[in-house]
């Protein structure tokens, strides 16, 4: 097995060595729950990486949204270039769940758009877990949803080895059984093609590398890897495992047993409806279920097969579904990032799913077994865990109560202090804020302003614009990608002030911000709790010149706790800096990193101009041309003809450049 090994030019500093040692010892000793309480900018991700290196366990890192998961995955890939770092989030670009509105007699069919790249990354994650031990998976709460039986997934895997006696047609049948499609023309992920004694398979977990199996009679003579686009042979394999193209793939034997049980449940349900004089519902459930059964018999699957997953898995009613957690070995390690947000999210998933399914079951659209195609309940989630580390600057009561060890990470490697907090009266707050904004902008820095209401945020934005301050408003209707673009523009200085409500909290790392203003800080509530205030204060902890202004007429209990905690941390940080002769330095962070979090993790860097691309690849222009040709074909295939034409123009310029060399 490859060892999990961190590659970094940095060594642990400040509180990091103590936190790494303390939590690693706890994991190896058998502590189930621990907390890493790390302030913003203290290098919690690096600490997590070093703990993983110390304990050498397959690891799941749980984040509360796709953007944060992508950002973490990117960082872990830099720390562990020799190991398998995977990304597992929901593969839906768009998802409209199946539902029934009884009041208007409206049935809403499930409608979804699946992101092929993310589906590939999900398959890559599960296959990595079954093939190796040096695995780190960064996931959203998608990991607590049903994923199919890992034992069945493993049993259906096709193992091919050089010199093996294997009937070619038998392999083709098995490929179809695990939901690969035969396609001689459009050779894409999850398909295979046959040309004489040569079988080409495009694994569901691969981007562009396919497998070529060459036969001599019934003997496998050669197994090679090739580029699916160019056909160029890129490697030789002695052995290859082909994992199913769907996590819900089921063997014929299990499918037949499952169909009989579905028919039995259907018969019972129809009789129940007839007994209650619900003839329409009885007819509906019979028609819909029989159609699904017919599809399963003919194709091996049906649309919405996940609703029958409990029966196909052979589980008892009410038992938890199989999830990504079941693909891990028993001794895996879980990090819950931003646990104060992530854990409540995990808690809330089951309730929302159950209420939606009530109508579908009660009105004859689904069998009662559909209830068991669901996310895990919180207690079920906890029962699957073995070693857990909660990671947060503001851990919740649940985390602190559960943890046998809380490791504090208050010292930042850069020497940065928690910001100074100034409390000012509400009267005249806008004029005072205007004056502070001008001073901050004059020094070349940016400003974050957080309000309590949407109307105030909008009015404030308009007011500052009228006062010739470049201001933008970040509201909840803005999607993730647009949000990251706005943050990038703030960092670049395209505007100076960003106004928001509850959007200036976790994951907003902007070193250019030197002032955070909190309006109506004395209004007790969720947005002004001590934990929320500490998170907002943390947004100013990346700049050595930063300060926080709270506008309030009274010091609330939440404000008092947040101010005291921040001052406690400042004292510890100042003493450490004095003892070690450290001068606080503003974090220097590449601006491109902010927007890269929204891309699929494996994407290659785009160049800002053709000249930059040529300069970066001057010795490999032919490779660059091949890359753009692949991009052009992909764009044309997706009917994005303007983009394809743009790539064509680039290719022509590159070829001209090549001829001049």
UniProtKB/Swiss-Prot annotation:
In terms of one coarse class, where is the protein primarily found? cytoplasm
Q: Where in the cell is it found?
A: Cytoplasm
Q: According to the UniProt entry, where does the motif Beta-hairpin sit in this chain?
A: 91-114
Binding locations of ATP = 38-45
Which residue numbers delimit the Helicase ATP-binding domain?
Answer: 25-412
Q: Which domain of life is it from?
A: Bacteria
Indicate whether Cytoplasm appears among the record's keywords: yes
Domain (Helicase C-terminal): residue spans on this chain: 429-595
GO annotation, biological process = nucleotide-excision repair; SOS response
Which keywords has UniProt assigned to this entry? ATP-binding, Cytoplasm, DNA damage, DNA excision, DNA repair, Excision nuclease, Nucleotide-binding, SOS response
Q: Does the keyword Cytoplasm apply?
A: yes
Quaternary structure and partners: Forms a heterotetramer with UvrA during the search for lesions. Interacts with UvrC in an incision complex.
Q: Which PANTHER family match?
A: UVRABC SYSTEM PROTEIN B
Name of this protein: UvrABC system protein B
Q: Which organism is it from?
A: Clostridium tetani (strain Massachusetts / E88)
